Amino acid sequence: MAEKHIQAYKDYVKGMKYKDLAEKYGVSVNTIKSWKQRHGWERKKGAPIEKSVHTKKGGQPGNKNALGNNGGAPQKNQNAVTHGFFSKFLPEETLEIMEEIQERSPADMIWDQIQIQYAAILRAQKIMFVSDKEEMIKELKKKRSLISEVSEIEDGLVISFSTWFRYRLYSETNT
């Protein structure tokens, strides 16, 4: 059976028809068709049919309708954007940063976060340094001044931070 389909293929390539192959090898026409499909038989085909090639571009000769128009959409056109979520709500700088992040590996990003956290802890140490228990920091939050003909009055809201409060803020930022 294996040799039959090889011999039948050779005859098929020479141009024999299914019916003639079936009679010669003593099998049905459908068996010949299944061999053709199963083993991928193909005959050499003649010259391809030539198709006319469209060479002219644009309108009729002398037509000035689209003179100077190169076609296509304007620059920075967003017609091809699927939904535009990011470009609609995020500024271009943020989008550029996101594109650069895509190039970095997750391990590099984790290492950067560790370094940033460590730097923040060291900076907080310097800011939150307490020299003694009684130290107080006073900040002027609001300042209001009233100038009249008689005198000048200044009023301000002063906020004081005690040592224990600063230490609490410091420990909260480290967690």
Curated annotation (Swiss-Prot):
Disulfide bonding pattern of the chain: none
Compositional bias per record (Basic and acidic residues), positions renumbered to this chain: 43-53
UniProt region (Disordered), positions on chain: 43-77
InterPro entries found in the cross-reference section: Homeodomain-like_sf, XtmA-like_N
Pfam families found in the cross-reference section: Phage_terminase (PF10668)
Name used for this protein in its record: Uncharacterized protein YjcR
